[in-house]
Amino acid sequence: MNEDIKNNLNNSDEFNGKIIVGLDEAGRGPVIGPMVIASVKINENDLPKLHDLGLKDSKQLTKKKREELYIKISEICDVKKIVIDPEKIDEQMEIINLNKIELGAFSKLANHFIKENENISIYIDACSSNEQSFSNQFKAKLINKNVEIIAEHKADENYKIVSAASIIAKVTRDNVIEEYKEIFGEIGSGYPSDPKTKKFLKNYVHENKGLPKIARKSWATSKNLLKEIEESKIFQWVK
């Protein structure tokens, strides 16, 4: 997209009756916990308020800063979220892939706002490097095919409205992870590469002969752990 248009979106102070919506997710890759899809809606003339917050992609902010911005964003914008728990992810992954699960949630939130507003632009962080294909698939799910769609890979780094959605999604997921820790103890971040997460899952599986409900059973990490248990049973039987 033209840089002038990007700058206008991030600094607009003229109201033309347009509604701006940003969409992003948190938690695509983790083996533990939900995937959260978040949307933020704002009148275009209020965009400078977001700009003044100094928003960035949620991954570039500290936990404390994200939590502070979460409150401020919620005061400025109409915020909505969809939390897809691990069991639901596993259920849907038997039929469709993760991109389509995400697209379905994105379109559900977008359609909510489209029902209320005809003059609307939707900015979305594309979950595919093929932005045009993603945009076409997203638009096909909308109740109004004429709304303006700006779908870009890493849009959370380029547009304040998407940065805001990124922060809402990330803080929401982080809060769920903290709730898990109160029940299970240290579980790490939930990502397969996190040593604390791997240790928790391995110990849990060996002690309970199965995965906790907070784990995504369709993930390779989970399948490998269950395979280890089955192989150990066979080994013991052979002995």
Curated annotation (Swiss-Prot):
One of its GO terms (molecular function) is RNA-DNA hybrid ribonuclease activity. It is found in: Cytoplasm. This is Ribonuclease HII. Its main location: cytoplasm. Residues 18-231 form the RNase H type-2 domain. Its EC number is 3.1.26.4. Keywords: Cytoplasm, Endonuclease, Hydrolase, Manganese, Metal-binding, Nuclease. It is an enzyme of class 3 (hydrolase).
